[in-house]
Structures are given as structure tokens and as C-alpha cells.
């Protein structure tokens, strides 16, 4: 049966605004976040850009004054520095609209060269750097997802409700034990299908098999205190990752993870020095994909239905045949 979107293009544009406004407003209230302005590009020598998995090349250019700058991959490090500079109180934080270009992305139905997300970060105490605190924050964020689903399906009754009452917590190692014969990505799909919504914890370090579930930069998340929010998405038959987040590295975990990742050359960068010398505050933070959220709540088959990006002629032809209306 041919795909028919529940909303036409004009309805979709209006609904995108409704979803984003509602989610943003409730997220800021739930986590006590203040909206701030954020950079589109940074100076590489600052160490503030997010190296992601370590292989993605940032888009860079030189300015008229001769400086070389990079388009951000994410604002994971910049936000922590901003909290320090703005003198934000404990248990309060900031959020921003983050726009990025990921030139090495493998584009498909859920991946684009253009990334738009809410990046958020809040200050916590040293004592809050534990798994229970992390789970508590995840539950608060999940409550915002639930409220958003209730709101948008009331506004547009033809849209479907998909979220279970509660989110399930599971570690990457537990996932490997449960589905030993599946690839890491297929484990996520299987768990999302079984539970409806999962928070997949402890991503970045090696599992008992000797493999990593997924790569993570060594200098922002603590690999023992991080995770991804993943929802079952029946329309595509996958587990759709909506958010990556975690308690950030302290001086001890940064030291350990730089050694493991063979990235000890980063120690001398200003950002890393400020963590190792206990200058920066302890924080928790993450990114929440705006286009992914709109895809999920508006029952869209392709991310290009909720964001304007560029796609190959082949993708345009496939979408035309499948009745997918790209923005």
C-alpha cells in the first residue's frame, strides 16, 4: 500500500511549529532551563567542537581576518563552558537551538547533512554524578514526550499515539547479552520493539565481546553515566533515536577515557585543562533532535518531510515513487 501522509505540506509546516513550541516550552520548565544564544562556528584550537566518533570532518572556512573556524558538530563542550561563564546556579541550566552541518553523514530516511536539535545542559553537584540521578532526569524528559504526544494527537486526531506509559532502562551490555547474534543497531531495534521506549545506558566503552556498542567522544559524556533515548517507530520498523545525553566527564573519567581512546594530546587544550583542574562545573546535558521529534509525532516516513535539506536525484526519485513530499 502506498504511503499517504496524515498531513499535507501546509498542515505539516504548521504542525512542526506546534510540536517544537510545545516541547521546547515544557522541556525548559521541567528541567529549569534558560534559553541562550549559541555559536554556529568555533575556533578549532579551543577544543570546543564535538569530535563525535572521531572520524567526521567538520566544515571549516577562513574568515576575512585570517582565522580558521569550524561549523559545530554539537555544542556539548560549549554549553559547559557557557554555564561556567554565566554563573548559573546549581540544578539550573541552559538550552539553545543548535544547527549543525555533518558533511560525512550517511543520509537516509532518518539522517540528513543538516542537524537541528535542542542542546541543553544543567549544573549538578558532585554527589549527583550517579545512575539514579541520570534516570530521574530521563524520566522528566520522557514526561515531556508524553505530554507532547497527548497535545499533538488532540490537535490532529488522525495522528497516532505510540508511547508506552513508562520508559525502560537497559545497558548496552545487557542488550548484547540479550541479543548476542544481532548487530548493535539491530539490538536497539529489537529492544525498542519489545519495550516501546528505552533509555540505552553506558555507551562508549568496550563490552564483554570486546566490541563497543557505539563510538563516543572521550571528552564529554562519562561512558558509565550516559545513554540514548530510543522509541519504537512502527512506520519504519526501527528503534528511532530521539536524544543522546549523559552526565559529563569529571577530572577522573576524562583522564581515564582520554587514555582509553588514545587522545591524550587533547589534555593541553583549554577546555580539557579546565576539567582536569576542576574549574568547570559538574554537569548533565544532551541533545534532542527536533526533526526526529517531528517525524515521530507527525507520522512521517522521511526526515526530509519535516526539514529542508539537500538530497540526491536518486532519493528524490525514490520519494516521488513512494509519494513522499520532501520540503
Curated annotation (Swiss-Prot):
PROSITE patterns to which the protein is assigned, alphabetical: AA_TRNA_LIGASE_II
EC number per UniProt: 6.3.1.1
Keyword Transcription regulation: no
Functional pathway: Amino-acid biosynthesis; L-asparagine biosynthesis; L-asparagine from L-aspartate (ammonia route): step 1/1
Keywords: Amino-acid biosynthesis, Asparagine biosynthesis, ATP-binding, Cytoplasm, Ligase, Nucleotide-binding
GO MF annotation list: aspartate-ammonia ligase activity; ATP binding
Pfam families: AsnA
Cellular component terms per the entry's GO annotation: cytosol
NCBIfam families in UniProt: asnA
Protein family: Belongs to the class-II aminoacyl-tRNA synthetase family. AsnA subfamily.
Protein name: Aspartate--ammonia ligase
Natural source organism: Fusobacterium nucleatum subsp. nucleatum (strain ATCC 25586 / DSM 15643 / BCRC 10681 / CIP 101130 / JCM 8532 / KCTC 2640 / LMG 13131 / VPI 4355)
Taxonomy of the source species: Bacteria, Fusobacteriati, Fusobacteriota, Fusobacteriia, Fusobacteriales
